[in-house]
From Swiss-Prot:
InterPro entries tied to this protein: ATP-cone_dom, NrdR-like_N, RNR_NrdR-like
Cofactor binding summary note: Binds 1 zinc ion.
Family the UniProt entry places it in: Belongs to the NrdR family.
Family matches, as Pfam families: ATP-cone, Zn_ribbon_NrdR
Keyword Transcription regulation belongs to the record: yes
This protein's name: Transcriptional repressor NrdR
Span of domain ATP-cone: 49-139
Natural source organism: Thermomicrobium roseum (strain ATCC 27502 / DSM 5159 / P-2)
Zinc finger boundaries on the chain: unnamed: 3-34
UniProt key word Transcription: yes
Co-factor(s): Zn(2+)
Family annotation (PANTHER family): TRANSCRIPTIONAL REPRESSOR NRDR
Function: Negatively regulates transcription of bacterial ribonucleotide reductase nrd genes and operons by binding to NrdR-boxes.
HAMAP family assigned to the protein according to its UniProt record, in alphabetical order: NrdR (MF_00440)
Length: 161
């Protein structure tokens, strides 16, 4: 590993720690030549995936697009950025485990829905409404009932008092 300070090629590892549940490794290194310390990160290089859209178009898998969709679904919800990272890592891991170079966008959507369903019902409904293209409130009601939601009894107002 090349030292960022002096350019020497020899450095020794003085500490290693797993990050993100083993998804990456942080290493503290010390340059043999100048003695200065620096940090490097290692991560398995993701497999280059093409996403096959519903209309048949193909585009490269974009983790930023996935993260943005999750951010929008989870906006103003009590969910930490670490949870978003966990979902992104889960999606990437499951897609890579397929061992294929193309994945349907529907598979990505279903993995995200599964993870959101376990995490936050509101975020799940937000994501599902876009992903499943809810046409009307009836679609929304059906999805909410599938989550176990039941409508409240109608409340009548007594106008005589």
């Amino acid at each position: 590993m090349k030292c960022p300070y002096c350019g020497a090629r020899d450095a020794r590892v003085i500490d290693s720690r797993e990050l993100n549940g083993g998804e990456s490794i942080r290493r503290r290194r010390e340059c043999i030549a100048c003695g200065r310390r620096f940090t490097t990160y290692e991560r398995v290089e993701p497999i280059w995936l093409m996403v096959v859209k519903r209309d048949g178009r193909r585009e490269p898998f974009d983790v930023g697009k996935l993260r943005e969709g999750l951010r929008l679904a989870l906006k103003k919800r009590p969910v930490s950025p670490d949870e978003i990272d966990r979902i992104v890592a889960t999606v990437e891991r499951e897609l890579q485990s397929l061992g294929t170079s193309e994945v349907p966008s529907t598979l990505i959507g279903e993995i995200v829905l599964r993870e959101l369903k376990q995490l936050d019902d509101v975020a799940y409904i937000r994501f599902a409404s876009v992903y499943r293209r809810f046409a009307d409130l009836e679609d929304l009601r059906r999805e909410m009932e599938a989550l176990g939601w039941r409508p409240r009894a109608a409340v009548t107002v007594d106008e005589t008092s």
